[in-house]
C-alpha cells in the first residue's frame, strides 16, 4: 500500500444475499489473507456518519474501488453512486481507480462494459481469479 492510501481497496457490493454473503464470507477474507487492506462498509464506515459521506471517504481513501457486479448490484442507486465517485476521481487524477469483478452474469451500463473486468462467476476458478485480482490491487492506479 502506498503512503497516501489508507486502504488498498474499497469493495462496492450489494448487501442482499447471495452477493453480501459471498463478498463478506469469501472474497474479503481471501483478499485480507493475501495481506491487502480492505475497506468494507460494515467494518469501516463510522457509526452515525452520513452514508454518502462515508462512501466518498472510502473511495478517496482507497487505491481502488472494486465493483462486485451482479444483477442486484446494477439495480442499486447506492452502488451506482460509488461507481460514479470512483470514475470521477479516476478522471480527475488520470488514474484507473475503478476495477470490477463479475460475481453473477449481468449486463452493466456502457461505461462499465468498456472496462476489462475479472470473471469470477465460476466457483471452481475462484482461487486463480483471486490471485490475479490480488496482484492487480497491488499495482499503482496510474500504471
Feature locations, PLM:
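Conserved N-terminal substructure of TIR/SEFIR domains
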Residues: 1-68, 87-96, 103, 110, ...
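Short amphipathic alpha-helical segments
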Residues: 23-25, 78-81, 112-113
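Nucleotide phosphate-binding site architecture
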Residues: 46, 74, 118
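A broad detector of the eukaryotic-type serine/threonine protein kinase catalytic domain
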Residues: 67-71, 117
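Conserved TIR/SEFIR loop-to-helix hotspot centered on a Trp-containing motif
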Residues: 71-91
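Conserved beta-strand scaffold positions in the cores of enzyme catalytic domains, especially
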Residues: 98-100, 117-119
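Glycine-rich, charge-decorated loop segments at or immediately adjacent to ligand/cofactor-binding or catalytic sites
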Residues: 105-117
Amino acid at each position: 500500500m502506498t503512503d497516501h492510501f489508507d486502504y488498498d481497496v474499497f469493495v462496492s457490493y450489494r448487501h442482499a444475499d447471495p452477493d453480501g454473503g459471498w463478498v463478506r464470507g469469501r472474497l474479503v477474507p481471501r483478499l485480507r489473507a493475501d495481506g491487502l487492506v480492505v475497506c468494507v462498509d460494515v467494518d469501516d464506515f463510522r457509526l452515525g456518519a452520513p452514508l454518502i459521506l462515508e462512501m466518498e471517504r472510502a473511495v478517496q481513501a482507497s487505491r481502488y474501488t472494486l465493483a462486485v457486479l451482479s444483477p442486484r448490484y446494477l439495480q442499486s442507486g447506492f452502488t451506482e453512486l460509488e461507481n460514479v465517485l470512483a470514475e470521477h476521481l479516476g478522471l480527475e487524477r488520470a488514474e484507473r481507480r475503478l476495477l470490477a469483478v463479475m460475481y453473477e452474469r449481468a449486463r452493466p451500463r456502457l461505461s462499465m462494459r468498456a472496462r476489462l473486468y475479472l470473471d469470477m462467476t465460476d466457483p471452481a476458478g475462484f482461487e486463480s481469479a483471486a490471485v490475479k485480482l490480488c496482484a492487480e490491487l497491488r499495482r499503482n492506479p496510474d500504471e
